[in-house]
Amino acid sequence: MTKTQHPLPEYPRPALRRDSFESLNGLWQFAITKSAQLPRQWEGDILVPYSPETRASGVGRTLQPGEWLHYHRSFAPPAGSGGRVLLHFGAVDYACAVQVNGHLVGGHRGGYWPFTFDITEALNADHNRLWVAVQDPTGAGVQARGKQTLRPGGMFYPAQSGIWQTVWLERVPDNYIETLTVTPDYDARTVTVRARTAKPGGAVNLWAVVRAGGVTIAEDWGSDEADRDGAVTLNIPEEHFFPWSPDSPFLYDLTVGTTQGEEESFDTVHSYFALRKWSCAPDAKGVLRFCLNDRPLLLNGLLDQGYWPEGLYTPPSDAAVVHELQTIKELGFNLLRKHAKIEPQRWYYHCDKLGLIVWQDMVNGGEPYRLWFVTYLTNVLQPLLRKLPDTAALRGLLSRRSEASREEYGRELEATVEALRGHPCIGCWVPFNEGWGQFDAAQAVETLHTLDPDRLVDEASGWYDQGGGDVDSRHNYFYPLHLRPGRRTVALSEYGGIAWPMPGHEPPRRTYGYGTAKSRAELTGRYRKLQLETVLPQLRNGLSALVYTQVSDVEDEVNGLFTYDRAAIKPDPAAVRAVNQALEAAFEKTVE
């Protein structure tokens, strides 16, 4: 990648699209200082949206707690006149303040969620200056940070900070659509569209059109069907009822608009949705299974951490993302567990289009972890400790001692659902992983079911299981696998992780994994043996979801199916496909 490139130029928000769009990705000026004040001198250029810690940014420097990362660039307003001009950030890690032409236009905290500022009043007619100041405490704070650490090694990776998703401008009408909530109902064969405008309370008329394959199949042009709260429900005709599934990921196109007065002010946005239904129900033998559209489905997938060697959280291109996801699908997988990270919106859009199901982790945070307890001791003594209660007495051990930390998690959970709920690919929320920052898991399940009643919840992936949610979620790297059906559906939500550092591909400083192969042939053989001799027999014992560790190598971890650079598949691809076909056939026979 060269600094002259314009990275990630694609429209960043496919589920709420307008024709007006101008990317601000590219070269910005930067400086790292000890002060929040505008620096007197810039240190050089940084390629946005790559964090300064990454090679792709051209900087290669780690932001320390207490330091300020400053960005600066000039820009012209989007083409057109009138209305409002919005400045969007896909994600900035962690806290930032934004100025335009010396005017503070807003601030934000939270490193994984999009935010927007109306900068109209701060704009000049032609030349404008944008300044962003960022702080990121990484492990010194309680905020969501995932696998980031200032001391990387093993299963934890280099910290990154600042802008790591697309920055962009758009021109909108005065009373524009701020948010669009699309709620499909599989059983009723309807879709309810709700729009919130920038100036609520007025006599805004909402209209919506649904198309399937370019053909208009349902529409409402502001008739009495439109509610006064800005919502409209449309019926999907029987002949155009196409359920979404991995084998047939059909997406309906949706256009939504508003009019006001005598159509003097209006907005039009484009989106999409799918009709699909998640549930847990007994199979023909009475064993609980995950069901998609009322049919048992084996969820066969991979743990996906979403790291790239040059950009860490940020991919080299949209094409690289699509290629990886397509290859995963071609290998016979239908599930990705998005682990300790929230991706840019386009990643979920591609999963929607390709038919890849996503189990979405809440990004872990809290006070510094006592890894000797939550990771190492519990992993080894899992039979004794995996159901340890996450009550107030243990909040210190689980890194949620402070009220501020717990309140931060509550805000982050709601922000995650708000940002991602429109994506059909997401089938399950995972509020906690292996006790990292876990507290009151039962309350988290209740909150998620209230915010989003149409999806499943894996209360505590691995441990500490409180007996709630929809999933009996097991991690197993070391013990013989003995499962049995119960009142929740059984998932092996982490396992495998066989390491092999493939020669010629990003050699690690240290090799990390769960058992090490010495060659491609050995890796392929061990993978096949694990899947067919250990995992497959457990299907009859209720096993309904598999999450092998992992998609790709990441830093020291060399237990991926792909190399870190995504240039090679480490085991024999034909063998992986054959194994997945065998698992699917065995599951179909088991549930009959």
Q: Can you name each region flagged by the protein language model?
A:
Residues 180-181, 255-328, 582, 587-589:
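N-terminal carbohydrate-binding accessory modules
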Residues 335-580, 586-591:
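Substrate-binding/catalytic cleft of secreted carbohydrate-active enzymes
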